[in-house]
Regions:
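RNase H-like polynucleotidyl transferase catalytic core
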Residues: 29
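Glycine-rich, flexible N-terminal cofactor/catalytic loop recognition
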Residues: 1-10, 15-23
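TOPRIM fold recognition
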Residues: 2, 20, 24, 32, ...
Length: 178
């Protein structure tokens, strides 16, 4: 499968793994402290062919994703579930994911809206047991996996749901199927 967009990954091992899954060009951030030069490369790539961000499903990966989203408008996001990106020793990274899971993530990219869009507020997430309660974390993980928006804490979940334009009905439907 050939991908037109550039795929942004964290490092060389991620590039090697992604290129085994799909035919593509990659941009490596080389860590979570993205410099202006790398951001400029990503901006140029976005203008020419588009960009898909595929970072590790962990804190540094989320930080990279957030920095890119803040500085480069219109990038798409591909997420791999944390459990699918773990090796036998528990280390998390795109380089540990099965090729089929990488391909699947790239085939189901999400694009956030450029403008603030708030169809869901915090009270809905509380009512649905996604923020408060002993089962909230598990319910968030299920919802995040079904909607393909990556691992999220309560605050991040609200931002992601609104950024990707999900409605209260979308969230309720995804949770109904659990």
């Amino acid at each position: 499968m050939k991908i037109n967009e550039f795929i942004v990954v964290e490092g060389r091992d991620d590039t090697e793994r992604v290129k085994r899954a799909v035919e593509c060009d990659t941009i490596e951030t080389n860590g979570s402290a993205i410099n202006e030069q790398t951001l400029e490369v990503i901006r140029n790539a976005q203008q020419s062919r588009g960009v898909i961000v595929l970072t590790d499903p962990d804190f540094p990966g989320d930080k990279i994703r957030s920095t890119i989203t803040e500085h480069v408008k219109g990038v798409k996001h591909a997420y791999i579930d944390r459990e699918k990106a773990k090796n036998k020793k528990g280390k998390i990274g795109v380089e540990h994911a099965d090729l089929i899971d990488i391909k699947e993530a790239i085939m189901h990219v999400s694009s956030p809206f450029d403008e603030a869009y708030e169809s869901i507020d915090k009270s809905v997430l509380i009512e649905l047991g996604l923020i408060v309660g002993k089962d909230a974390r598990r319910r968030r993980e299920i919802l995040s996996r079904k909607l393909r928006i990556g691992h999220s804490n309560g605050k991040q979940l609200l931002k992601k749901l609104n950024a990707f334009g999900y409605t209260e009905a979308d969230v309720r439907q995804a949770l109904e199927d659990e």
